[in-house]
Amino acid sequence: MDKLDNINKAIYDQYRAVVLCANFSDCNQVLTTIKSIVCHNRFIKFYVINSDFPTEWFVSMRKKLAKLACQIINARVSSSLVSNCKTDSSYTVFLRYFVADFVEEDKALYLDCDIVVTRDLSSLFETELGDAPIAAVKDLGGEVYFGEQIFNSGVLLINVNYWRENDIAGQLIEMTDNLHDKVTQDDQSILNMLFENRWLELPLL
């Protein structure tokens, strides 16, 4: 028997939330990331924020993940909502803005869908966020190319309560509408501007 199946669920107050954002054309990448996570973790609730994944995909995934003590949620954002946002990039860059609209847990781990997880994530979820809106890994190229310390938006431990109470989605959308043609790194630039000097640094994974 997989030793992960022997983990006592009682050690967790609730499922740990992992957020992935994609359109259906990237479903293979989403699947690869999910597989890598469940190889090393149990009691994960996956939120896939999307606008076009078919319901049948989630039905199939729920059956498979239930055997691994995991869940998956179809966090559907209407295409009309994201199409109203101004951007020079794919609308999928906006999807992570809506984390607090769907996630029930106090914190959530957002991962880009090109990430492969190679270890237990428990210690990461135990990070105390306090009043910080996010914890993130420093982007090593920030000081070299931009002369400033910035974070990489591909891995974010999100303080969901903070996002909800402070309407972070609304702030991000407004900033994107106003600045999308003035920034160099799309949504990563916007996130860094909003959370400047307010984010916690995570160790390199």
For the regions a protein language model found, what residue spans apply to each?
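N-proximal low-complexity "stem/linker" segments adjacent to membrane-targeting elements
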Residues: 1-32
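Short aromatic/hydrophobic "clamp" motif used to bind/position activated sugar donors
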Residues: 108
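Conserved donor-nucleotide/metal-binding helix-loop-beta segment in metal-dependent transferases, i.e.
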Residues: 115-146
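Active-site-proximal specificity loops/subdomain of glycosyltransferases
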Residues: 56-58, 63-102
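Short, acidic, metal-binding catalytic loop of nucleotide-sugar glycosyltransferases
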Residues: 36-44
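Short internal beta-strands
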Residues: 45-52, 136
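Catalytic metal- and UDP-sugar-binding loop of GT-A-like glycosyltransferases, i.e.
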Residues: 111
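Catalytic core and acceptor-binding pocket of nucleotide-sugar-dependent glycosyltransferases
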Residues: 150-205
